[in-house]
């Protein structure tokens, strides 16, 4: 490894055992992230005999697999490296389930709304980044995203707390009485991205509906600093807020608002984007990203150790979509990427990544979440150097169906009977649960 001066190390380069990263040198970034991506894929077991395509080794749950494939999509796009594209394609298609809505039978009794959502976010990402389309006889990326959105929207529960999604789909699962932010924030987030991709106003209406409910029950603050909290219980009519703050929840609301501003040009969504960005400062110390709720006391569980990955991804997309956020976000991403690179100096391979990026070396922590977080923060330093998310009017070529996911299904709260010709975008779902169909009928079918 070459020696570097203190000044250059502070600005753009870090050199450590096993991993060298120079943010001013794209080849250096490609080489460094290739090592991190390889370490991430070390946890993938779907190619092994008797294992399930798309799944990672224990103890990593199904939802985190969806998050990991989203991470690998970012790696492909920003690093222009298609090494793992066949695995990404196979995983995203294998886990769709019989109804192509990411409720596969092997997960259907334990799956929560948030679990399903992270696969929906991954396929939305595939559509927006123009990842190679599936074969013609397979569901397309936009279709799969719409199916996830529609099945989640059907579970909107107006009978308790005036609305909102429950955490769990089935009554027998722990957490059924909890309406958590990640489920509702993900519904908002997916609606916002579908709105921008399709131009369909009914998705905007849905995003506004979810946002207003979350604000009404105080899951999100209203002001110039909009902090995002964990959830509420229906047992006290959603009056007591669990005030844990997680990076991925903040990111869902931040980037969802950015998508809506980019689509609508609305001052309201511009203001909200900046308010969520202001509140995001709680997750940085000297511009280095950390999971504030658990990292200090060293109590982060397996899931929580991956949250920074999604937040870094959502920061990158926000910077792409809202120019005024770029200076702050890129300062955070660049500083955090260099810090993360220092942590990727552990293990027998010399480039296993850790959890704590404040150190100048590996902290002894390792796992899928650590690799994901380091990879996402590194590749998103390039967020402004590639084309922003595509949509149906600027080069996006994924096809869908506004009625996707509305086939009668045991996970839906009520069976639906919709003919094949009923394809008026997301307005179908809006109409089913009481929103006007008049405006929705004017939109194109995707």
UniProtKB/Swiss-Prot annotation:
Reaction equations catalysed: Random hydrolysis of (1->6)-alpha-D-mannosidic linkages in unbranched (1->6)-mannans
Pfam families: Glyco_hydro_76 (PF03663)
Alphabetically ordered keywords of this record: Cell membrane, Cell wall, Cell wall biogenesis/degradation, Glycoprotein, Glycosidase, GPI-anchor, Hydrolase, Lipoprotein, Membrane, Secreted, Signal
Top EC class of this enzyme: hydrolase
Intracellular or extracellular location(s): Secreted, Cell wall; Cell membrane
SUPFAM superfamilies noted in UniProt: Six-hairpin glycosidases
Propeptide boundaries: 423-446
GO BP: budding cell bud growth; carbohydrate catabolic process; cell wall organization; fungal-type cell wall biogenesis
Chief location: secreted
EC number of the protein: 3.2.1.101
UniProt cross-references to PANTHER family, sorted A to Z: MANNAN ENDO-1,6-ALPHA-MANNOSIDASE DCW1
Recorded family membership: Belongs to the glycosyl hydrolase 76 family.
Name of the protein: Mannan endo-1,6-alpha-mannosidase DCW1
């Amino acid at each position: 490894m070459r020696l570097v001066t203190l000044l250059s190390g502070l600005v753009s380069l870090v050199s450590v055992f096993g991993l060298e990263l120079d943010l001013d040198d794209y080849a250096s970034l490609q080489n460094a992230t290739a090592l991190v991506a390889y370490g991430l894929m070390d946890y993938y077991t779907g190619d092994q005999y008797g294992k399930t395509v798309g799944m990672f080794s224990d103890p990593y749950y199904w939802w985190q697999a969806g998050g990991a494939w989203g991470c690998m999509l970012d790696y492909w796009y920003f690093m222009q490296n298609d090494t793992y594209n066949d695995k990404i394609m196979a995983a995203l298609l294998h886990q769709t389930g019989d109804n192509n809505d990411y409720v596969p039978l092997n997960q259907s009794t334990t799956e929560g709304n948030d679990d399903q959502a992270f696969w929906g976010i991954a396929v939305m990402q595939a559509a927006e980044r123009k990842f190679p389309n599936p074969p013609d006889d397979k569901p397309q990326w936009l279709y799969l995203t719409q199916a996830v959105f529609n099945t989640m929207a059907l579970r909107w529960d107006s009978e308790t707390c005036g609305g909102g999604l429950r955490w769990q789909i089935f009554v027998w699962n722990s957490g059924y009485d909890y309406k958590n932010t990640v489920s509702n924030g993900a519904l908002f987030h997916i609606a916002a991205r579908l709105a921008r991709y399709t131009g369909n106003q009914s998705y905007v209406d849905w995003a506004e509906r979810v946002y207003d409910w979350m604000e009404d029950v105080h899951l999100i603050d209203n002001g110039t600093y909009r902090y995002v909290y964990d959830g509420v219980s229906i047992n006290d009519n959603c009056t007591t807020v669990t005030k844990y703050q997680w990076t991925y929840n903040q990111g869902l609301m931040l980037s969802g608002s950015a998508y809506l501003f980019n689509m609508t040009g609305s001052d309201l969504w511009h203001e909200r984007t900046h308010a969520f960005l202001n509140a995001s400062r709680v997750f940085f110390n000297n511009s280095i990203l950390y999971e504030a709720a658990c990292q200090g006391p060293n109590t982060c569980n397996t899931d929580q150790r991956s949250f920074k990955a999604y937040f870094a991804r959502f920061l990158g997309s926000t910077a792409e979509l809202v120019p005024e956020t770029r200076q702050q976000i890129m300062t955070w991403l660049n500083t955090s990427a260099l810090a993360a690179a220092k942590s990727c100096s552990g293990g027998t391979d010399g480039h296993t990544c850790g959890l704590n990026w404040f150190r100048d070396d590996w902290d002894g922590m390792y796992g899928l979440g650590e690799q994901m977080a380091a990879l996402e923060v590194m590749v998103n330093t390039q967020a402004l150097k590639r084309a922003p998310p595509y949509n149906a009017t600027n080069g996006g070529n994924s096809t869908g169906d506004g009625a996707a996911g509305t086939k009668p299904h045991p996970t839906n709260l009520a069976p639906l009977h919709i003919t094949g010709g009923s394809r008026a975008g997301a307005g179908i779902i809006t109409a089913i649960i009481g929103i006007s169909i008049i405006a929705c009928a004017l939109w194109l079918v995707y």
